[in-house]
Structure formats: structure tokens, C-alpha cells
Amino acid sequence: MNSLVATPPIPPHFYEHNRFNTTSRFVSPMNPAGSRKRKAEDDNGSSDHDTRMSASPTSSPALPTKPLAARQIKRPRPNLSGRPLSLGRLFETLDSDALRSVLRSLCDRHPELGQEVVDTAPRPNITSALQVLSNYQSTLQSSFPLGGNPSSDYAYNRVRPHVMNLLDALNDFTPHFLPPNETHPSTSLNYLDGVTEIIHQLPRWDTPHYNLEKEAAYEEIAKAWALVIREASKRGGGIQLQYGEWDQKLAKHNQTSGGKLQDAVHELSASLGWMAGNPSHPGPGCPQADTASIRQQLLSGTYGAGLPLKVGPW
């Protein structure tokens, strides 16, 4: 009876105290000195690191700063809807044929725009004009029927519209390169040289009266040659005609055409009467021939080459 002693009850706050102290009993004790040493090293390292980071460099060069361009960001339209193209974008979609059609239609409906277009458009040059004529020539050559006689009446009827288109273009382009509209004789001569080659390529037909169109083209181009030669002979004593070998070029064209350019050849001979081998040039005793001979020697730098050099008092 004496061994069974009633155990007094344990107050609740005692359990709370033991619960908080239970973890500390299982944690291994740490070295106080080591803990203090590591803490001092960490503090010193952190202090040195802060000092290095806060210090500004003394020897590093200053890098130039470039101002950044403000980016222009296109924001999407809040209300997107269909709309037609602007005039500039519309022109970008048109090829040369469509653009010519639009301009021709505008000029027909508004005649006052025609002169403004002429004043605004760049002046046609030899290359562009001959290219247009060459395109007509290529269309003509490709329109011949396959097989058969290319100079027959059947072939003529097939290609006649293209022949007329080429001849109409020749009649329109040639006056543009003639004086007084064209003030440079070299430009006129080079154009006539190229366009005469195109006339040489016109077909010859078995029926004689079908060839009248080509002969008329030769007649007109011969008149153009004569006009340009007369104007060129007035500039610089005809030096462009003499040193441009135009006598040889024109003689070759005349031979290819079968003598259709003989009038132009005579005009060139009259303008350059001192040329060797010219049957129409004046005789040696004529004052005009003597003047031309002196001019020729001055231009070639041989004047006075055969005269003795006089030394001493005059």
C-alpha cells in the first residue's frame, strides 16, 4: 500500500518547455572560436567586396556613348478596313504598255495635258529611238509564215500591217533628230546611220509595185542625210564630216541601197570638195581648191612642213 504512491499531475506548461528544448539536445555543439573566426572573415570579405564595387576606375578609358535612335513602331490600326491603292503604288503595278495606254487615254480626254506630258517627259535619245524601231523590225521578221517563199504575194499580205507600222514609226522619229529640232550634227548623223540599216533590212518582194514603200523610205532618208550634211558643213568647216569617216559610211549605205542615196553622196561631196578622189571637187588652180588645201593642212598640222626655215634679218 505504501509502494503505490500517487504521482502528482504534471502541469501543461511543462510539456511546452520540454518540446522547445528537445531539438537543442540533439544538435551537436559547435566550436565557439571557429564560429567567431568564420564570421570575422565573412565580414572582412564582404567589406572588401563592397569597397571594390563602390570604387570608380581611375585608368579605364571612357567609352563614347552613341545616342540610340528612337524606334518607330507602327501600331496596328484599331479599325482595319479595305481601301484602294495610292497613286504611287498603282503606278508600280503597271507595265510600260499599260502605262502608255493610261497616258494616251488621259491625253485624249484632256488635250491640255498633252503638252504638259511633252514638257515633263525626258527627251528621247538615239538608243531609245533605235530600240523602238528595232522592236518593230523584230515583230515584222517574226510575222513571216513558216515555209514557202518569203518574197511572195502571200507573205506580203501577211506582214504588210507590220511593215506599215515600222514605216510610220520611221516617219515619226526621223524629224525629231533633224535640224533645227536637233542642234548637234553628230547626233543626227548617228541616228541616220542606225535607221538606214533598218531600212536595208526591209524585205524585197517579187511583185515590183510592192517595193514602192521601201523605195519611198530610201528617198525620205536620202533627203534627211542631205539636210544634216548641209548643216554639219556650216559648223567648224565640216570637220565632223571629214574626221567621222561619214564619206565611207554613206558610200557603203548607197551601195547597199542600190544607189538610192546618191543625192546624199553628192551633197557630201559638195560640202567637202577637197576630199581626195572626189570627181566634183574643184581643180588645182581654182582659188576655192587652194583655200580648201590650206585648211586641210592646218587641220592636219602639216602646213609649212616643206618650206625652208629662214634665219637672219628679214
Swiss-Prot record:
It is found in: Cytoplasm; Nucleus. Keywords: Cytoplasm, Nucleus, Protein transport, Transport. Residues 39-52 have a biased composition (Basic and acidic residues). One of its GO terms (biological process) is proteasome localization. GO terms for molecular function: proteasome binding. Residues 54-68 have a biased composition (Low complexity). Disulfide bonds: none annotated. InterPro entries: Cut8/Sts1_fam, Cut8/Sts1_sf. Residues 24-85 are annotated as: Disordered. GO terms for cellular component: cytoplasm; nuclear membrane. Involved in ubiquitin-mediated protein degradation. Regulatory factor in the ubiquitin/proteasome pathway that controls the turnover of proteasome substrates. Targets proteasomes to the nucleus and facilitates the degradation of nuclear proteins. Binds the proteasome. Belongs to the cut8/STS1 family. This is Tethering factor for nuclear proteasome STS1. It comes from Coccidioides posadasii (strain RMSCC 757 / Silveira) (Valley fever fungus). The gene is STS1.
